């Protein structure tokens, strides 16, 4: 907190009870960090436009054929997952065949790019004792197709996967999984290096790798991507639960 920010907080809390000041100071500092992270994300990813912990997709052009649970399509689109301290932005373009109920990809000829930005955690600020589970969402650019019996129309929404990732801060390792995008994606154990983890990934018969970074002043978040067949395929992010010591 800068001297100017400290003065701002003091002026706004002259009449605040002493018992409430610490709580308000914590909230004040958190908001300062969120504001700093928003600037680092870039002007395209404002928190007003992209609410926290929500997947948002925008299609520029598409053509598709759907037969029951099978979707074959050519789509140009972006998927954004915004959290307080990080943003995961995926761009996809090209042909793909997938199960529109499970999100499982049968064939993938898309060009893709997944970029992660935000307030990176300083390596010295990552906790050194205990363990914690990070939970959040993931995407692979597939869509869930549903039928509305009231309107008699088919509707689609971006398919959401779920991330669960455990960090053992004492051992400096992390591993986890992503469910809800076809077969479970296993994120095998990797070692914390600086403020990042990189290790192998597996989904059924497919093998690849993943990378993630820590975000927030105190490693409150992780955000990263999974690479299969040499290209960015899955984006993910998660927020930290309580550290168990």
PLM features: residue spans?
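Mature soluble binding/inhibitory domains
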Residues: 1-245
């Amino acid at each position: 907190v800068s001297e100017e920010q400290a003065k701002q907080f003091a002026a706004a809390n002259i009449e605040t009870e002493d018992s409430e000041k610490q709580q308000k100071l914590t909230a004040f500092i958190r908001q300062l960090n969120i504001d700093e992270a928003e600037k680092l994300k870039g002007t395209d990813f404002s928190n007003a436009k992209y609410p926290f912990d929500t997947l948002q997709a925008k299609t520029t052009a598409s053509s598709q054929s759907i037969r029951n649970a099978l979707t074959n399509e050519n789509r140009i689109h972006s998927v954004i997952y915004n959290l307080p301290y990080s943003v995961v932005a995926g761009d996809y373009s090209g042909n793909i065949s997938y199960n529109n109920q499970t999100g499982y990809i049968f064939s993938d000829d898309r060009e893709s790019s997944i970029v992660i930005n935000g307030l990176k955690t300083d390596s010295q600020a990552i906790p050194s004792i205990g363990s914690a589970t990070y939970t959040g969402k993931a995407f692979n650019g597939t869509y869930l197709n549903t039928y509305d019996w009231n309107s008699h129309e088919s509707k689609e929404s971006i398919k959401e996967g779920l991330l669960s990732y455990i960090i053992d801060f004492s051992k400096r390792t992390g591993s986890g999984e992503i469910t809800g995008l076809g077969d479970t994606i296993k994120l095998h154990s990797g070692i914390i290096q600086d403020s990042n983890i990189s290790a192998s990934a597996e989904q059924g018969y497919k093998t690849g790798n993943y990378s993630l970074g820590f975000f927030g002043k105190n490693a409150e978040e992780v955000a990263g991507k999974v690479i299969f067949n040499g290209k960015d395929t899955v984006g993910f992010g998660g927020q930290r639960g309580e550290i168990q010591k």
